Amino acid sequence: MSRTVRIAATFACALVATTSCAITADDEPRALAVTTTTTTEPATPTVGGSTAVLWMLDDGQLVPLSLSLPDHMVSTVLGALFDPSSDTDEQHRGLTSSVPVDARLEDVELNGGTLTVNMSEEFDNVVGPSRQQAIAQIVLTATEFPNIERVRFEVDGEPVQVATPTRGDAGTVTACDYVSLLADPTNTTQSTVDDDTRERLAERTATLETTCVPT
């Protein structure tokens, strides 16, 4: 049973009724044309329309995507990963997401640099490499915020360990755990990945390669 979702007071979110259907495990990145909506609890109080950076997939590797959102709260930015359909332009870029289409972001909680991300049970429908990609998308997006250093995950309020490329399963992860999943800035497959995106990707890659200590 999911714990009660705390609704962000900064903007209204329409609840979309979905038709019940059989659920199968998701092992491939999905295209961005989805209709799921989500409500989340804000982790930071910054409000006002702004541009945020989400991390999506280009041929299975992580690339940044600038997205205009109503505010720059952590819950809003991560919520867009679970419901990217609000930005129709990104659907034409050929980018994908491994975050399962039917999963919901229940809430987020920031405590001393560690963000706890609570997701609905549908997140468990993604398995294998796609699950690791989905976790990496969330971690890279969350750690765009300077006050977030680490991420923990919960499913229906229960702590879960998540896979990393180098450390195996871990209860707390950082962006350093997913450096190997970043796209090569000089070899992105989508022709519409513009120079600004490549520059942002190169900067984040250089920062992580400098600051991350091999384990």
Model-derived features: where do they sit?
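Bimodal "functional hotspot" detector
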Residues: 1-215
